Amino acid sequence: MADNLRTFATACQGGLVINQDPLTQGGQFAGTATRMINYEPALNGGYRRISGFTNTYGEVTGEADTPVLGVHVSADINDGIFAARKPASGNNYIHKWNNSTESWDAITTSGSPTMVGVSKVRFENFNWGTPKFAMVDGVNPASTWDGTTYTQLNGGQAPSAPSLVAAFNNHLFLAGDSSEPYNLYFSAPVDETDWTPASGAGVINVGFNIVQLKAFRNELFIFGANNIKRLVGNNIADFVLQTVTNNLGCVAPDSVVEFNGDIIFLAPDGIRPVSGTDRIGDIELATLSKPIQSIFEDYTANEDLAAITTVVVKKKSQFRFFFANQDSLGIIGAVRRSGQGGAGFEFSQLVGMEVNCAASGYIGDEEYVIHGDGSGYVYRQEVGNNFNNNPIFSLFKTPFFYMDDPELRKTYYSINTYMRAEGEVSVSMAVDYDYGDPDTEVSTDYGLSTAGAAAYYDKATYDATDIYDGNPSPVESTNIAGSAKSIAIRYVTNSTDPSHTIQAITITYGLGDRR
């Protein structure tokens, strides 16, 4: 019997893949997943159950039962965390977090802005000598905050109700006014309050309804639903509008983010980058999300793409797409760098987070990832082991492994799961055979449990909550008994346990016959 035993081994990498046939995926891409929810590509290899979020910032002052309209991180202004919500009375819709009192302080506005009809407030940081950020909402004139003074931008030819804002080459750009959706306005140089042509301000008709603006290096990209253009130059004297494409556009305004040295956006056929190639002035557009293409077809049919919220988690080389409904499946996209110096995109899905708006940024050397919900509360992500005291559901299912021969029956004896745990963790493991054939017996669930994570001394202080390494034994062994041509494994949790990472899998099996 021992001479007949074989070992199948695969490292967990490649992420969620649903565009391959079963034989190709189970052979060439064995480390990928056919289902993956609330796992993320781990920095140390494998798939990690995501961290939780907590209501660090409580409820933003405002009218009862109204959503958070926008959140923002600006490290150099006040304590760095800001949120917008419709006020119960008056006009003070923007609030700053006070670290000392652990409460929200209303910012006194001017110009009588209203939040009636506002669905989202967008922000843009800039610094032309003093750190500030601009705000737009599609109902009121744009405004700025410098930590002391709220200023409406309603002079000269400034648009009355822009919904889009970008800072580019010492000018503030505004667009998205529903009364003139094709116009792109820019301020005078180094003066966001001056919108007079004599000072160098101006307006450009781009020829299509503007969906989003994004400055990137020495270019300002202007997205439409079916077009993309870019603006180059330094001021009104040499600004030039150039066409990128007239056959492709952006379907979700808040999907446009800078990520991994590029701009990415959601197009009708999935996630795309706007990438400069080696040829000067050339632009390359390629779909990044081919492995999960059918998911975006489902989104087009069942979700409001205009309501997508995107946030970047820089320390993990990761972006996240959210929908406001916590039962909707969002997307994690991440860059996985290989030991050979290469890199590729991997994807997973998210569920269980109600995200009406989100933002991220560094305050000091610490990254803050925050979001606001539909009831006025602001949360910090990447904190803790639960979703605001609720358990985190996670699911990872492998492809069906057929060990080089899909027609040869095997007898399966054991599964070794190489797992790093960040504390005491229980994971339910189940086995499926022969592509879910109802005539093949399905195994019962198996329980994996770690004995707890190791701790270490940090700055001469013993801290049992810090993690030095995974569970003392990185291998969880499970004896199984089954006979089939192929086998797939599912890992499921629904708990408040610490996170764990599934890094690799081995299966011990024996060769059978063909029948």
Predicted regions mapped to residue ranges:
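Beta-sheet repeat architectures centered on beta-propellers
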Residues: 1-105, 112-132, 247-262, 268-515
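Surface-exposed ligand/attachment interfaces on beta-rich extracellular proteins
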Residues: 62-65, 152-162, 203-206, 212
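Short beta-strand motif characteristic of blades in beta-propeller domains
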Residues: 82-84, 135, 172-176, 219-224, ...
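Surface-exposed extracellular loop regions of Gram-negative outer-membrane beta-barrel proteins
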Residues: 92, 220-245
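Short loop/turn segments that connect beta-strands within beta-propeller blades
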Residues: 98-101, 146-148, 190, 233-236, ...
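Hydrophobic or amphipathic alpha-helical targeting/insertion segments
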Residues: 121-155
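Carboxylate/His-rich catalytic cores and anion/metal-binding grooves
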Residues: 160-191
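A short, charged helix-loop
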Residues: 189-202
